[in-house]
């Protein structure tokens, strides 16, 4: 049972942007189904300004966060970082690594993914002057051009669409974002699939490293669950007229360092919450049981 229908289905999975050389971005007239981004990301960023103005992380102490912080130190040092955690040692490490005063620490008193991120993301939007920011899992690692590509992609699709999530590609994530999953008639060249050079529209984004605007965040937030929180927020945003996209930007994902790899347990945990609070979505995940 698809989570989105009608207006969304006709675009879902299509390539809407590709990078094929150099040109003047100002003169581009994108169409809905096949856009061509024929300029370098750095040039595009200078033309269309700034976005994705902070990184927000919630953690329960996964060792992977130390690797994430090192990659932020190397590739996103200038972005403010908001962290929800109960570790004072981690707070000291973050300030020491990034060596700036734009690190905000908040206690993490939540018992699930949804509530943890709702709290820290809402705090960042309320106390920071941000139009958009990046939600990050604590077990991902940035590449040198992750932020650059996502900034360019987010600004570009935002010219034509109400953007819900723009999610990074990864190696341990939903199929639409997964670099291990080739598109139909894909070509493997220069150590990657040709489709990785494209933005595409999709039904659901796993926001392991994903951009969202303040406007979209005020429209829908995560349910109080671990699993299926992504599906539900994406569904709610689609119903409100937003579209979700897969970026060309990439992050490595260690995978399930927080909720674990017992998939049957993860599937069953949110059953009663969804049945009680989101009965409209219950059948999507659990059928008639």
Q: What is each model feature region?
A:
Residues 191-212:
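A recurrent flexible, glycine/aromatic-enriched loop bordering the glycosyltransferase active site
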Residues 61-75:
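Short, well-formed alpha-helical segments that are part of the catalytic scaffolds
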Residues 108-124:
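Glycine-rich, basic loop-to-helix element that forms the pyrophosphate-binding segment
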Residues 130-141:
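Short beta-strand-to-loop acidic/aromatic patch adjacent to the donor-nucleotide binding site
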Residues 164-181:
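Short beta-strand-to-loop element that shapes/binds the nucleotide-sugar donor at the catalytic cleft/hinge
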Residues 145-165:
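Conserved donor-nucleotide/metal-binding helix-loop-beta segment in metal-dependent transferases, i.e.
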Residues 3-38, 223-289:
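C-terminal catalytic/acceptor-binding lobe
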Residues 73-106:
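Acidic donor-binding segment of Leloir-type glycosyltransferases
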């Amino acid at each position: 049972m698809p989570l989105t229908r009608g207006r969304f289905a006709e675009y879902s999975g299509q390539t809407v942007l590709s990078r094929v050389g150099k040109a003047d971005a100002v003169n581009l007239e994108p169409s809905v189904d096949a856009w061509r981004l024929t300029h370098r990301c750095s040039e595009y960023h200078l033309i269309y300004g700034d976005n994705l103005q902070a990184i927000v992380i919630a953690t329960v102490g996964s060792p992977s966060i130390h690797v994430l912080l090192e990659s932020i130190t190397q590739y996103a040092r200038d972005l403010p970082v908001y962290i929800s955690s109960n570790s004072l040692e981690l707070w000291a490490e973050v300030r020491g690594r990034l060596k700036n005063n734009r690190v905000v620490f908040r206690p993490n008193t939540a018992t699930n993914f949804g509530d943890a991120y709702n709290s820290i993301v809402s705090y960042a939007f309320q106390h920071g002057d941000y139009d958009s920011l990046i939600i990050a899992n604590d077990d991902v690692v940035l590449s040198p051009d992750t932020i650059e590509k996502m900034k360019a992609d987010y600004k570009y699709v935002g010219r034509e669409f109400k953007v819900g999530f723009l999610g990074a590609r990864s190696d341990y994530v939903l199929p639409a974002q997964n670099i291990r999953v080739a598109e139909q008639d894909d070509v493997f060249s220069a150590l990657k699939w040709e489709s990785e050079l494209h933005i595409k529209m999709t039904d659901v984004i796993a926001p392991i490293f994903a951009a969202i605007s303040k406007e979209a965040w005020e429209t829908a937030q995560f349910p109080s669950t671990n699993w299926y929180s992504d599906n539900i927020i994406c569904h709610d945003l689609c119903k409100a007229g937003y579209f979700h996209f897969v970026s060309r930007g990439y992050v490595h994902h260690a995978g399930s360092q927080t909720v674990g790899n017992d998939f049957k347990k993860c599937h069953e945990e949110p059953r009663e919450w969804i049945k009680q609070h989101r009965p409209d979505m219950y059948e999507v995940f659990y059928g008639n049981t």
